[in-house]
């Protein structure tokens, strides 16, 4: 559901320094048992909370997740009492986080296309350029589907908010990321190319009003799984700006003890992806903290990517350490951008 407050007002966002922002009028009900019936939980929720001010705005039968919308001023009380009011089900209650993009426009104009040589792309193409049998989902802020980098290869496009294939341009992040993953090789000499230019592109928009609720991100990933994506790129995540001032030992303790509910949720999504032989690829994050703090990065079955600069040293912003699987160029990276142009960007997204 789009991010809205009461009466369609501005999003009721609670800003929390050092941890992800949350939407004040939503809660997640996450069923502990994979065999539980989320339809039954939805029915019992409405029996316990029959007033129209309590509503169900999303659910997923496979992830066993229910998203409810409630009055902002009742959120804390409902968190404390909802389990006892719906005693026939075991579920975890946690907040709806708001995620952000892991990339931004770069001021770099020198050595455009350096990343293509750094990863020895042409040598890699002697093995494969990808295949039209392979679908790569780009779960992001939208895409310019008409960009020449993507001609004839867009499939199963989806907007989780409008529930159709009408995608916006967003901030250009999705267009840039898609170009790096599966953009045409025709622009290699200009410094732009996808790594796997023969693959199909499945763009999935999970941003509304420049914000991505966690429920929208989960819905986007699940759409990709249900539509047979072979790879799902997720260059989106929670912000932990400011935590880099903490000693690494304290960060490690946070990674071990905090954000466990969201970690459980992602573990179930990753398990479902593994059953479908789908690879989930996450950007590690740009907060200069341990990669293991963002809970989506804690799954062995996914691939988590950190960023290096032109010297192949870690960028100043990249997350690092435990749960990092591979590093790739992420500074001054040239790729497709709206409208019908190209742009350098920085980030673990890249």
Predicted regions and their residues:
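Subtilisin-like serine protease catalytic core
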Residues: 123-156, 164-215, 227-230, 241, ...
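Extracellular S/T/G-rich loop segment that most often corresponds to the catalytic His/Ser-adjacent loop
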Residues: 139-141, 148, 278, 293-350
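Catalytic-core regions built around general acid/base machinery
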Residues: 253-279, 297
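Protease zymogen maturation seam
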Residues: 2-14, 20, 55-63, 83-135, ...
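Short amphipathic alpha-helices in soluble, non-transmembrane regions
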Residues: 41-48, 78-86
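Short acidic, glycine-rich surface-loop motifs adjacent to enzyme active sites
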Residues: 223-260, 283
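Short glycine-/aliphatic-rich beta-strand segments at the starts of folded cytosolic domains
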Residues: 21-32
